[in-house]
Regions:
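Low-complexity, charge- and small-residue-enriched intrinsically disordered regions
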Residues: 1, 5-21
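Long, low-complexity or tandemly repetitive, helically biased scaffold regions used
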Residues: 21-24, 28, 41-132
């Protein structure tokens, strides 16, 4: 026990016992993951179709990123969903276009698809009422 603990009056209050993990609502989380999977499939298909700049290496990289997230989402639905797996999935998800920047001409149809993916991703980050 350090002097700071004594100063703050926490003498003997150290509790290093493990914290019980909060259980996730498996059915609800799988349903959310199913929605995200469908949205990602739609976005990837649209990104890989004309008039998208598929000859641009950066664009191809973004398609690969979303395909990776799609694979992770599919895999998570087939096993017990954990908080760590959800964090890993959602932490790497980013919008297709930078907010506040103009969207390149001809790619406006991708904005609602990307927004849907990000909205569903943010919902996965929030605890459900059944998980309280």
């Amino acid at each position: 026990m350090g002097w700071l603990s004594r100063l703050l009056g926490r003498e003997g209050a150290d509790d290093d016992s493990p914290v019980a993990p909060r259980m996730l609502d498996q059915d609800a989380r799988r349903a959310q993951l199913g929605e995200l999977e469908a949205a990602l499939e739609e976005l990837v298909t649209a990104m890989d179709s004309p008039p998208s700049p598929v000859e641009n290496p950066g664009w191809v990289g973004r398609i690969k990123d979303y395909n990776h997230h799609l694979g992770t989402t599919t895999m998570l639905q087939k096993q017990p969903v954990t908080r760590e797996a959800l964090v890993e999935l959602t932490a790497g998800m980013r919008p297709l276009f930078t907010t506040g920047q103009p969207v390149p001409a001809g790619l406006e149809h991708l904005v609602p698809l990307s927004d849907r993916v990000i909205t569903l991703t943010r919902q996965l980050e929030e605890p459900l009422p059944s998980e309280a």
